[in-house]
Amino acid sequence: MQHIEEIKDYWNMRANGFSMAVEEELKTESGKKWEEIFRNTITKENAEVLDDGTGAGFFPVILSRLGHKVTAIDYSDEMTAQAAKRFKEAGAEVLVRQMDAQKLEFADESFDAVVSRNVLWNLDDPAAAYREMHRVLRPGGKLIISDGNMY
C-alpha cells in the first residue's frame, strides 16, 4: 500500500503540467483518433462508461461529446481536481471520484464500457485492476485499454 501512496504523491505533484498537456492533446490528431475509436467501438447510445484512471480527464471529454454518461476515477486527488475543472470548462457532465483502480467501489455489472489509458503500469497489482474492470463491466460490454510506460 505504501507504493500506491508514493504513486499518488508523484501524480499529485505533476497534475498541473499533465493537465496542460492533456488540454493540448485534445486539440491534436490523437483526440480525433480516439473519438473515432470510441464511436466505432462503444456503439450503444448513452452508454454508461467508466474511465478508470482518468488523470487530467482526456477520455471523458471525448466520450461526453459522443453522448455517453461518463464516470471518471483516479487515485490522485490533484488529478481529479484538474479533471473536474476540465469537464466544467468543456461543458461535459462527468461524475468524478477519487478511487483506487485495484479496488473499485461500484456494484458488479455497472458499466457498458470501461476505458483506461496509461494506468496499469503504475499499479502494484495490475491483475487486480483487470479483475475489477471485468467485474464492473456488463455482459457484452466493451473494455478498451491503451497502456505503456511513456517515461
Question: Could you describe each region identified by the protein language model?
Answer:
Residues 1-45, 58-62, 82:
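Conserved class I S-adenosyl-L-methionine
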Residues 50-103:
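Class I SAM-dependent methyltransferase SAM/SAH-binding core
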Residues 70, 143-144:
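A short hydrophobic/small-residue beta-strand
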Residues 78, 123-128:
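Short N-terminal helix/helix-N-cap motif within the alpha/beta-hydrolase-1
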Residues 102-113:
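A short acidic, Gly/Pro-enriched loop at the edge of an enzyme's catalytic core
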Residues 113-125:
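A short SAM/SAH-binding and catalytic strip from SAM-dependent methyltransferases
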Residues 127-139:
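A short glycine-rich, Lys/Arg-flanked "PGG" loop and its adjoining helix->strand segment in the class I
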